[in-house]
Curated annotation (Swiss-Prot):
Residues holding ATP 2: 698, 737, 739, 744, 769-772, 812, 824
Residues of the MGS-like domain: 919-1056
Positions bound to Mg(2+) 2: 294, 296
Annotated organism of origin: Methanoculleus marisnigri (strain ATCC 35101 / DSM 1498 / JR1)
Annotated spans, Allosteric domain: 921-1056
Self-association and partners: Composed of two chains; the small (or glutamine) chain promotes the hydrolysis of glutamine to ammonia, which is used by the large (or ammonia) chain to synthesize carbamoyl phosphate. Tetramer of heterodimers (alpha,beta)4.
Protein name, UniProt field: Carbamoyl phosphate synthase large chain
Residues holding ATP 1: 127, 167, 173-174, 206, 208, 213, 239-241, 282, 294
Source lineage: Archaea, Methanobacteriati, Methanobacteriota, Stenosarchaea group, Methanomicrobia
Length: 1056
């Protein structure tokens, strides 16, 4: 079938910022789709708000817009670019929602919807239309009722019964949904679900909790050829969102006739929807009976997993199908000889385990339900289920608490939390049987037997074992670290037992055809498929699962390093990573991909298999950097012909070690806040007293400010120290003087050991004290004096050269009373590197990679950027997905993702950034303000400005009295505890359009938390710092005076 010859230009809508339910998988799929369409000569216009994506790179698409993903703005881009088609299925739920909205507002006249037709979007996303379609084609769905008004609750309970599952239409990651066991729960979940749904609709359906959950990834072309790319089976039963479940591929517990029944149904459904491209279909299955649960008529999170599990490039194939190609006309890039119409075959086991953020959010509700809470996931490949399970757990890279109390174990098994998968192992260790656990969890006994096999092996290794038992353990995924702990043998004795892992290839065809894209996993079988060669090779350590503090930004840096090194003649680039969502784990990103845990032992096994010129650790974030020192020690011990490239591990340690770094700053005559390191509680008390409260306390070697806190007195310090020491047992507690009312600055730079290139100086909107990852920031700085900027440049160069940095460095400063203080230096990639690249056009990560293999900055001819526009980075906070989380921003990071606003002045750029972060600032209506007594004087100019702009002010008694006394009109509204009607009632009614609420202290946080929770639930923009309120007033002022600019990114960089 010929390509659609009239499709010359296609618009792809990205998925926006990383958030719970929608992570890096859509950068992976969107980037793949852009490349696929450009291969076919189609011009690609891409719009996305997330600067930390590969798809927003200038060489991914022909025209790139970094703009808020709002239908009215995308409509302007469509009018300007005049695309022939729009590809909606690559941007996740956001892309589908935007396409539906654009169609409804008439913006798609003359624009063909490619791949997923509009009717399929409606039938897949509108719960009533989906149910009607399934009934029409004779496919069973759970008994259900559509609910659009709260007065239908009693009828829904009578019709469907309890427990019931609530599924809102057009939402992401099950947002706003849940399982209701009582009428009260039903009312609470339905109210939230209706508020979150784009069309104010929820489906209340009978619960099939406890049934098996099975997924099929299906592909279909215009000639009606359908294939199953991958079947996947959730270890967790129905009742837990698939994104929260442990997932196994291929399907292992269905008989062939059962599998064929579901396969036939999946193909029937994709045909009924008329989807041309990829589609994800979810089934509930029990004892020969099944129900259709959900259809995603787009590339999804499960698509990314299926793609990495099989090696089949789903997004690439779907994009080519969308412009008219048949499956048999599209080549499988992994084999290079088979068409995409061949169903993939796999001869190994893949396991996905989610990564949850509860190490950051101690107060969050950890219960797993139908709404997602995980931020990322890991994938492991093994020859057996046991091996894949063990490798997946190792890949999570977090401390799993062991449970020994049978009552506690029973509670976790019956009311699942993020601890349940690990607790299955604990249950067997404490003597639970397979039958008992199956009854408590509804998990298929097959998987429980595999976990029991692992625990039985542990017992054998702890007692009397034979060398053969060690070999069996290794084939079951046990690491050398596991073996040392269990056998109590020395490393030498374990090594003497012999054996090294072999590497097998993921090739989509179970070795039926040779693969041209080398994609490997380790196992302890015979026959290694990895071939040693003489090429000059570099191994880059990836960043692992997305978590708070370590997001897609580090994958961006990893991919840029690969791109840069592949431009250098004669360098072969290999990646090790375990995140199935990312571009770096796309099989054709690097010359060789290893899907492995990011542990010292696993990395060393790779290095021992081939001669590597060097290893790069600074692009994968703090976790990769933490491997630098032990990796170098092992390389030396084994006398391997490789080295850590770029900044030396000793220099990294000098930046992390507080005492060494302080001595360097003293020698360079650069100011820093008074600080010290304490190795005991007593030392900490003494040093905090000497420095003077308030102090900032944190463990050393942390990621994203983990366990960092602002401490005001000795009592707070004592309660904190226990937590900090537990988080980082091997390292001291760091105590810093807290600089109140200071402006914070971030700098990203590259050094080659001789020269330093400063890529960007970013001024934070929020003052020091809010974690840099949670603060909005702006390039170029808006309030810093030339003298301050000159000192920041000078200090950056001195520190980079003083540490001996070769590659990237990020330095954080605070400015108070015209003094520039250094807060910390990180000689590695930072989360702001992609933002700097998109704001300035300078690809720092690429430059750094070249410097690390010997290139000099002077030879590259890269000048420090000077820009005439303004770019603002704003963050996305996860409070709408994590009930119970404290919404107060502080020194510990909470955001999951970021967006960028770009325009020709600060006000409009900040307005765009807030809009992109789903915090759109109102230009009319009522603003509720509540601030501390200390902040009231600072509030006054902001309040006056908002009144000048025509907004009405509301507040509680203290704030209203102060404003009125100072000539600013304000209206009184009651506090929550003062009875109704109060501020929450006003928010619920829709009369409040913006919240400015800064909590005074821990005692006043309860009011703040209630107000902020209501703001999140009812979608009201909120501001928690006065600095952000000041910026918001500037943004509203700017937007009322002048329209925002809609221009391609290339225009800002002078490339178009």
């Amino acid at each position: 079938m010929p390509k659609k010859s009239h499709i010359k230009k296609v618009l792809i809508i990205g998925s926006g910022p990383i958030q719970i339910g929608q992570a890096a998988e859509f950068d992976f799929s969107g980037s793949q789709a852009c490349r696929a369409l450009r291969e076919e000569g189609v011009e690609v216009v891409l719009v996305n708000s997330n600067p930390a994506t590969i798809q927003t790179d200038p060489d991914t698409a022909d025209v790139i817009y970094i703009e808020p993903l709002k239908a009215e703005l995308i409509a302007k881009i469509i009018a300007k670019e005049k695309p022939d088609g729009i590809l909606s299925g690559m941007g996740g739920q956001t892309g589908l929602n935007m396409t539906a909205e654009l169609a409804e507002m008439g913006a798609l006249e003359g624009v063909e919807i490619l791949g997923t037709p509009l009717e399929a979007i409606y039938r897949g996303e509108d719960r009533e239309q989906f149910r009607d379609l399934m009934n029409a084609i004779g496919e069973p769905v759970p008994r259900s009722m559509i609910l659009e008004h709260m007065n239908q609750i009693d009828e829904a309970i009578r019709e469907v019964g309890l427990p019931a599952i609530i599924r809102p239409a057009y939402t992401l990651g099950g947002s706003g949904g849940g399982v209701a066991h009582t009428p009260e729960e039903m009312r609470r979940i339905c109210e939230l679900g209706l508020a979150r749904s784009r069309i104010h609709q929820v489906l209340v359906e009978e619960s099939v909790a406890g049934w098996k959950e099975i997924e099929f990834e299906v592909m279909r072309d215009a000639a009606d050829t359908c294939i199953i790319v991958c079947g996947m089976e959730n270890v967790d039963p129905m009742g837990i969102h698939t994104g929260e479940s442990v997932v196994v591929a291929p399907i292992l517990t269905l008989r062939d006739d059962e599998f064929q029944t579901l396969r036939t149904a999946a193909i029937k459904i994709i045909r009924a929807l008329d989807v041309q491209g990829g589609c994800n279909i979810q089934f509930a299955y029990k004892d020969g009976d099944y129900r259709i649960i959900e259809v995603n008529p787009r590339v999804s999170r499960s698509s990314a997993l299926a793609s990495k599990a099989t090696g089949y490039p789903i997004a690439r194939v779907a994009a080519k199908i969308a412009i008219g190609l048949r499956l048999d006309e599209i080549m499988n890039t992994v084999t290079g000889v088979t068409p995409a119409s061949f169903e993939p075959a796999i001869d190994y086991v893949v396991v996905k385990v989610p990564r949850w953020p509860f190490d950051k959010f101690k107060s969050a509700d950890r219960t797993l339900t139908t709404a997602m809470k995980s931020t990322g996931e890991v994938m492991a490949i093994g020859r057996t289920v046991e091996e894949a399970f063990k490798k997946a757990l190792r890949s999570l890279d977090n401390d799993m608490q062991q449970h020994t109390n049978p009552s506690e174990i029973r509670m976790i098994l019956t009311s699942p939390t993020d601890e349940r998968f690990g607790c299955l192992f604990d249950a067997f260790r404490e003597g639970f049987t397979v039958r008992e656990i199956a009854e408590l969890t509804a998990i298929t006994p097959f998987f429980l037997e595999k976990i029991k096999n692992i625990v039985d092996l542990e017992r054998k290794l702890e007692t009397d074992f034979e060398p053969e038992d060690v070999r069996v353990a290794r084939r079951s995924g046990f690491s050398d670290e596991d073996l040392l702990a269990l056998t109590k043998k020395t490393a030498g004795e374990i090594e003497a037992l012999g054996g090294t892992p072999t590497y097998k290839m993921v090739d989509t065809c179970a070795a039926e055809f040779p693969a041209t894209t080398p994609y490997f996993y380790s196992t302890w079988e015979e026959g290694c498929e990895l071939v040693r060669d003489s090429a000059k090779k570099v191994l880059i350590l990836g960043s692992g699962p997305i978590r708070i503090g370590q997001g897609i930004e580090f994958d961006y840096c990893t991919v840029h390093a690969v791109m840069a090194l592949r431009e250098e003649e004669g360098i072969e680039v290999h990646i090790v990573n375990n995140n199935p969502e990312t571009v770096s784990t796309d099989a054709d990103t690097s010359d060789r991909l290893f899907f492995e845990p990011m542990q010292l032992e696993d990395v060393m096994n790779i290095l021992k298999k081939d001669d590597y010129y060097g290893v790069m650790v600074q692009f994968g974030g703090q976790n990769s950097v933490n491997l630098a020192v032990p990796l170098e020690a092992e390389i030396r011990r084994l006398d391997l012909p490789t080295k850590i490239l770029g900044t030396s591990p000793d220099a990294m340690d000098a930046a992390e070690d507080r005492d060494r770094f302080s001595r360097l700053l003293t020698r360079l005559e650069i100011p820093s806040p008074a600080n010290s390191s304490a190795y005991s509680e007593e030392e900490a008390r003494e040093m905090a007293g000497e420095i003077g409260y308030p102090v900032l306390v944190r463990p050393s070697y942390v990621l994203g400010g983990r366990a960092m806190e602002l401490v005001h007195d000795e009592a707070e310090l004592e309660s904190y120290i226990k937590e900090a020491v537990r988080v980082s047992r091997k390292h001291p507690v760091l105590i810093d003087s807290f600089l109140q009312n200071a402006v914070e600055i971030d700098v990203d730079a590259v050094s080659d050991g001789t020269d330093v290139l400063i890529g960007g100086i970013m001024e934070h909107i929020e003052w020091a004290g809010v974690h840099s990852g949670d603060s909005a920031c702006v390039i170029p700085p808006q309030s810093l004096t030339p003298s301050v900027i000159a000192r920041v440049r000078d200090y950056t160069k001195k520190i980079a050269l003083g540490l001996g940095v070769v590659g990237l460095i990020n330095i954080q400063y605070a400015v108070r009373n015209d003094v520039v203080y250094v807060l910390e230096a990180n000689p590695r990639a930072s989360r702001t590197v992609p933002f700097v690249a998109k704001a300035t056009g300078i690809a720092l990560a690429k430059i750094a990679a070249k410097v690390m293999v010997g290139r000099k900055l002077a030879d590259m001819g890269v000048a420090e950027p000077e820009i005439e526009h303004v770019a603002v980075k704003e963050v996305l906070l996860p409070f709408n997905k994590l009930p119970g989380v404290d919404t107060v921003l502080g020194p510990e990071m909470k955001s999951t993702g970021e967006v960028m606003g770009i325009d020709y002045d600060f006000g409009r750029a900040y307005y765009k950034a807030c809009t992109a972060a789903d915090n759109t600032l109102p230009t009319t209506g009522n603003v509720f303000i509540s601030v501390t007594d200390e902040q009231k004087e600072e509030l006054l100019p902001v309040a006056r400005k908002l009144r000048e702009l025509g907004l009405s002010l509301y507040g509680t008694s203290g704030t209203v009295d102060f404003l009125t006394q100072n000539g600013v009109e304000a209206n009184l509204v009651r506090k929550v505890q003062e009875g109704s009607p109060n501020v929450i009632d006003a928010m619920r009614s829709g009369s409040i359009r913006l919240i400015i609420n800064t909590p005074a202290d821990k005692a006043s946080r309860q009011d703040h938390i209630q107000i902020m929770r209501a703001a999140v639930d009812y979608g009201i923009p909120y501001i928690t710092t006065l600095q952000a309120a000041r910026a918001a007033a500037m943004a509203i002022d700017a937007i009322k005076r002048e329209e925002i600019t809609i221009e391609p990114l290339g225009h800002y960089h002078g490339l178009m």
